[in-house]
Amino acid sequence: MERDQHQEICNDGGLLCESKEVSVNNHNSDAVEESEDTITSGNQEVSPANGPTLPILQKIIDCSDKIKILKDEHALVSNQVQEIKNCSLVEPEISRALQLLTTKLGALEKQYLEESSERKRLYNEVIELKGNIRVFCRCRPLNQAEIANGCASVAEFDTTQENELQILSSDSSKKHFKFDHVFKPDDGQETVFAQTKPIVTSVLDGYNVCIFAYGQTGTGKTFTMEGTPENRGVNYRTLEELFRCSESKSHLMKFELSVSMLEVYNEKIRDLLVDNSNQPPKKLEVKQSAEGTQEVPGLVEAQVYNTDGVWDLLKKGYAVRSVGSTAANEQSSRSHCLLRVTVKGENLINGQRTRSHLWLVDLAGSERVGKVEVEGERLKESQFINKSLSALGDVISALASKTSHIPYRNSKLTHMLQNSLGGDCKTLMFVQISPSSADLGETLCSLNFASRVRGIESGPARKQADVSELLKSKQMAEKLKHEEKETKKLQDNVQSLQLRLTAREHICRGLQDKVRDLEFQLAEERKTRIKQESRALATASSTTTTTSRHLRETLPTIIEKKPPLAPTRMRMPLRRITNFMPQQQPSQGHSKRFSDTTFKENNNSNRRSSSMDVNTLMKPRRSSIAFRPAPAPSAIASSNKTIMPRRRVSIATLRPEPSSLSSMETPSRPPPSFRGDPRKARYSKLFSPDRNLVTPNAMKSSRFMKSPLGGGGSSWKPSHPTVIALQKKAVVWSPLKFKNRRPSLVAIRSSASSSSASDLLRREQ
């Protein structure tokens, strides 16, 4: 009871256990002493009620031993607690250490990736140095039938040389053959796959790989490639290794595996994974893809996730493969079986994708028709098998001799293996031979063929990018090229527009300069015109008095006779009515009426005021004169005064042409048509309008100007109708027509001159 309490106290806490330790020890020591005294005193002291005391002492001793054990355990627990307390004090150091380890782990992972990529590169380089097409030779052991027939082995192997083989020929000579590796008859499937595994794993790195077995019938090709459920061959072991490698690289790469299986039977392609149905099999053909690889459209491609699924597919395909019995082999393959494994990989770090193929080919054996004793359907199969193998031999010979043309299309088999034999593919060939002396000829043929294959140099293999990614890249490249072309076109258009804009700006600046020059010229011409008009006004005012005197002298003569028109032949055709004076012809009969000084003054003043050629501006004009009929003779006789009719000349003037802006004065010389008739010249001189009045005041909307107004500022209407003779003519306007429109600076006839003319007419009446 006391022990249990002590144990409970010890379980509750170390302090209570330590406090009770002394009392327990004292109690134990007392008990031990009492027991010793009792024992030493002898066994005679026995209590009849309690019985013997020896078992109690033994129990006490046992309890003391247990207490010691508990004490040791307590000390151990105390030490652990103390260590935990010490660890809690160094927690920051632990966190720092963890961070350091994490950093080192990241660096190691990065270094691992670099080393892994370097290992892949070096490994692939070693494979390429050995040759893209590697040849392994495998010799099967003698079977029971051959041993029973007394056939000897003609193959000799050197244990020190793993890649050499000697064949004893019929003349007792030895022929040496050298390959990448030679497997002896006692080598198992594991040994064979151990040498095959390095090239198989290249498919995970993005390389195309092809493994095929060649040899005569009955040499173990199907056993090497397919194997048995107990001793599986290369096909199953290869897929198993691919799954194992893909799982080990799952943190770096993501892989997807799919399997297709077909056979070439009598030069016809047959899908071995298609579901059996009553429908006839679909015809399959070899086609070349856009990337240059050979594909079989319509072929079933089953995705696999583990080795069990792979084995189920392989058993399904092997079950429907064409197999027949011959004299050489009871289970002879009558077709070429091809297993294609498609591996799609994606790098989880940089996103790079690959798509590669692994071809596992079990070729049908070459046969001698006479030896295998076949006929009928088997004979036809043998002929097709030998034909396809002969085409394969032609391809190998062409590749070895490096001819320009390789006859891949001579057979469906060689057409499908085109990339594997002469392309960027890593190829491995198993040449299967028989050691029997009865098959010596076929063995030598197979070994010679394998030697030619080993001598082929097809160049280094390269990685296969994913077709979908390649197509996307091509589309993006084409789109980029198209965009570059469009950008170049737009840039050319922009440059041409900039050139055109520069040319337009240059033209605009030139036109602006021309406009400024024209404005300057116009301003100068206006100044010149103002000066000329000022001089013309001064000249007109000086000649007003002379004109009044001439009117008084010539009016009586005009009343008596109407001025005749010029003869028809001499008359000029009617033209536009102008405000220019006709030139005066010299007259012999009436030269005294008009003073020479008057004509000279007028001519001199007109010549000074005009700056343009007079001959080009003089044109015939027509005037209309209105006058009152003459009175009766009695009225004339009774009147002492001479009654003069009221007359007025109405003239329609046309706006001057833009080219005639430099000078608007009327020439003083009369036209040539009036030179022969002095009276016409007199009337033209008499009734010609004043130069100051016929000059237009401003550029108005009307094409013609009215007759000049009378003096006094009041409008005057004629009492007789006015006749206007016009001739329509197109007028060319100046582009500066409405530029800075200003009224004419020519003043209307002054009131002084107007009043003098009206007073003169009133006195004459």
From Swiss-Prot:
Residues 469-534 form a coiled coil. Residues 581-613, 654-678 are annotated as: Disordered. ATP binds at residues 215-222. Residues 132-456 form the Kinesin motor domain. One of its GO terms (molecular function) is microtubule motor activity. It comes from the Eukaryota. Disulfide bonds: none annotated. One of its GO terms (cellular component) is microtubule. SMART domains: KISc. This is Kinesin-like protein KIN-14S. It comes from Arabidopsis thaliana (Mouse-ear cress). The gene is KIN14S.
